[in-house]
């Protein structure tokens, strides 16, 4: 019998954590990666590694901007957000979180060894503390502040 692929076992364990924490995004992402790994599609991994985060951020940005583009959030509401203190505070927090996310992308790109820990931590936070899987990017940004890397 051939030896089991340790990387595949890790991916399966992370998928199981995703299922246990009811985090379908993590579960589906890992299952897709498993499918790529065990099929001839594995030749696409260099492309996924190079462009995956960029495409993910693009899709996330589309999702965030969709209510403005669809008209669900009107132009007057957007303009009004610059004069109410809660909205101004929301803008400041949004800038800070975006900055942290940028640091997170940089850290994850330059130190991929932290990715597994961030993912496991995110999944455990969802599973054990009823958290929301807002993402390893922000967690990586916070980590970059702690360890002093950008």
UniProtKB/Swiss-Prot annotation:
It is found in: Cell membrane. The chain crosses the membrane at residues 16-36, 51-71, 88-108, 114-134. Pfam families: DUF441. Keywords: Cell membrane, Membrane, Transmembrane, Transmembrane helix. One of its GO terms (cellular component) is plasma membrane. It is a multi-pass membrane protein. Belongs to the UPF0756 family. This is UPF0756 membrane protein YPO3057/y1423/YP_2679. It comes from Yersinia pestis. The lineage of its organism: Bacteria, Pseudomonadati, Pseudomonadota, Gammaproteobacteria, Enterobacterales.
């Amino acid at each position: 019998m051939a030896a089991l692929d340790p990387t595949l076992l890790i991916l399966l364990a992370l998928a199981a954590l995703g299922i246990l924490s009811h985090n379908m995004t993590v579960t589906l992402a890992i299952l897709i990666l498993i499918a790529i790994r065990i099929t001839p599609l594995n030749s696409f991994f260099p492309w996924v590694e190079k462009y995956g985060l960029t495409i993910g951020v693009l899709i996330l940005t589309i999702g965030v901007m969709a209510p403005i583009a669809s008209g669900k959030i009107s132009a007057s509401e957007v303009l009004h957000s610059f004069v109410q203190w809660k909205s101004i505070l929301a803008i400041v927090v949004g800038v800070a979180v975006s900055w942290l996310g940028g640091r997170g992308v940089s850290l994850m790109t330059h130190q991929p060894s932290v990715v597994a820990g961030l993912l496991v931590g995110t999944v455990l936070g969802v599973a054990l503390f009823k958290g929301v899987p807002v993402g390893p990017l922000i967690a990586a940004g916070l980590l970059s502040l702690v360890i002093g890397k950008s």
